[in-house]
């Protein structure tokens, strides 16, 4: 019997052209390179005889299952995604794809974020999902707008310093 999990929230089906290209490249690598490699290794492990005590065979079966699961996910997700490759009609306001610089009103610290789709978030690069609490609070704000965002660490006040969009 499987464990019950509450349904996951629907994520926004938006992605940047770069993010779409990365997901397609990952799918291509999994399907054309990694999967055939694992299938060959699995066949070699199966040829060794008794599969009940064959750790290599068990490992390769699990690895193949993980690859197939990711391939299915990426195939479905790429079909559902909408690539946003045009700048918004109002480049002074914060929308999907914006690179924003914020000032934390409490500490004065400057923070830089890019609002991207949920499939391309990267905390190290400052890329936050459009579904995140901060991005939701940021949408439609303009330079010098002050706003509050309810973050996991509590309520914070920010001021929008810069709004930029990458040239496409």
From Swiss-Prot:
Protein function: Necessary for efficient RNA polymerase transcription elongation past template-encoded arresting sites. The arresting sites in DNA have the property of trapping a certain fraction of elongating RNA polymerases that pass through, resulting in locked ternary complexes. Cleavage of the nascent transcript by cleavage factors such as GreA or GreB allows the resumption of elongation from the new 3'terminus. GreB releases sequences of up to 9 nucleotides in length.
Gene3D superfamilies per record: Transcription elongation factor, GreA/GreB, C-terminal domain, Transcription elongation factor, GreA/GreB, N-terminal domain
Organism: Xanthomonas campestris pv. campestris (strain ATCC 33913 / DSM 3586 / NCPPB 528 / LMG 568 / P 25)
Name of this chain's protein: Transcription elongation factor GreB
Keyword Cell membrane attributed: no
Pfam families assigned to the protein according to its UniProt record, in alphabetical order: GreA_GreB, GreA_GreB_N
Family of this protein: Belongs to the GreA/GreB family. GreB subfamily.
MF term (GO), any: RNA polymerase binding
PANTHER family (UniProt xref): TRANSCRIPTION ELONGATION FACTOR GREA, TRANSCRIPTION ELONGATION FACTOR GREB
Gene Ontology terms describing biological process: DNA-templated transcription elongation; regulation of DNA-templated transcription elongation
Gene: greB
Protein keywords: DNA-binding, Transcription, Transcription regulation
